Amino acid sequence: MEANGYRITHSADGPATILAIGTANPTNVVDQNAYPDFYFRVTNSEYLQELKAKFRRICEKAAIRKRHLYLTEEILRENPSLLAPMAPSFDARQAIVVEAVPKLAKEAAEKAIKEWGRPKSDITHLVFCSASGIDMPGSDLQLLKLLGLPPSVNRVMLYNVGCHAGGTALRVAKDLAENNRGARVLAVCSEVTVLSYRGPHPAHIESLFVQALFGDGAAALVVGSDPVDGVERPIFEIASASQVMLPESAEAVGGHLREIGLTFHLKSQLPSIIASNIEQSLTTACSPLGLSDWNQLFWAVHPGGRAILDQVEARLGLEKDRLAATRHVLSEYGNMQSATVLFILDEMRNRSAAEGHATTGEGLDWGVLLGFGPGLSIETVVLHSCRLN
């Protein structure tokens, strides 16, 4: 057999499809209104009253009601180096994340596999994505062991991609599913804020936004082409997936891993940069499918912050309810980096069923998942919803 014939024989017939979704969060929940008092107390920073007032304003404007955080007061007291703004603390942080990240991923993955309904031994590929710590072997292998997956599972580990990585994981899973007949890909995003948690300092205002916005969570999907009738229940079809880097925008958002942990920089122009470029990205992705009416699409938009959602909504002329699922996830969980857009897909399919819609996409046929992250990179995933029984 020639190479081309082999490729055709071993490729799937249909598009990649999301077959199951599972999510998980740490049990520790923080109330956003009460968090400024807790944060300044636990970091021994009550004397910084002006900074505390600024932090409170940031929390109030974030459109977040609560978040889940792995770091409890007990853990923080046991690791005082995490509390100081610029103290050498990488070893302490790393010791926490190498256990926390795969553990949280396991919870989400088990839920997804249970919903999927097939034996976990049928998983052929694993895509693991996290910006929370680096180790070799990585969290992908740890998760494989925790789940008891076959050692023959083909693994892809995506470290430190950034907040757009939920879209990246979907793009990679799509390619694996469509180019390997019968493949079932477990795609997992697991994020904890352990590396970026630190006390306040007047010289590091950007860190206040990180402490106010970010939360911890993991999401897992099972992705595969050609669903088995009567066994697998498709949720969304992945029609296309693409990435673009915006020119001359590298300094808009980024993170740097240092001895003090992970530090983020977020330029105030970030929302406007995204909004001014978003329509071009959407047109490039959607025009081949004949999609141009943005209000006839369902939306899963990475909530990097309230201002980003507001400006994207305004630029595209979206009706207020179009970003309802996105804003709900931001309110209940904060920005969970790569996992957030996958939480939004889960929220969307659940509320679509609860509200009696005909499809998993709020009654609409087509939709878009958008991820924004360092680069500045935009992931655009075009989805087709599936019928609800």
From Swiss-Prot:
Optimum pH is 6.5-7.5. The active site is at 163. Its EC number is 2.3.1.218. One of its GO terms (molecular function) is acyltransferase activity, transferring groups other than amino-acyl groups. It comes from the Eukaryota. It is an enzyme of class 2 (transferase). Signal peptide: none annotated. SUPFAM superfamilies: Thiolase-like. Expressed in both the leaf and rhizome, with higher expression in the rhizome. It catalyses: (E)-feruloyl-CoA + malonyl-CoA + H(+) = (E)-feruloylacetyl-CoA + CO2 + CoA; 4-coumaroyl-CoA + malonyl-CoA + H(+) = (4-coumaroyl)acetyl-CoA + CO2 + CoA. One of its GO terms (biological process) is polyketide biosynthetic process. Pathway: Secondary metabolite biosynthesis; flavonoid biosynthesis. Optimum temperature is 25-35 degrees Celsius. It holds the Pfam family Chal_sti_synt_C. Homodimer. Belongs to the thiolase-like superfamily. Chalcone/stilbene synthases family. Catalyzes the formation of feruloyldiketide-CoA by condensing feruloyl-CoA and malonyl-CoA in the curcuminoid biosynthesis. Has no activity with cinnamoyl-CoA. This is Phenylpropanoylacetyl-CoA synthase.
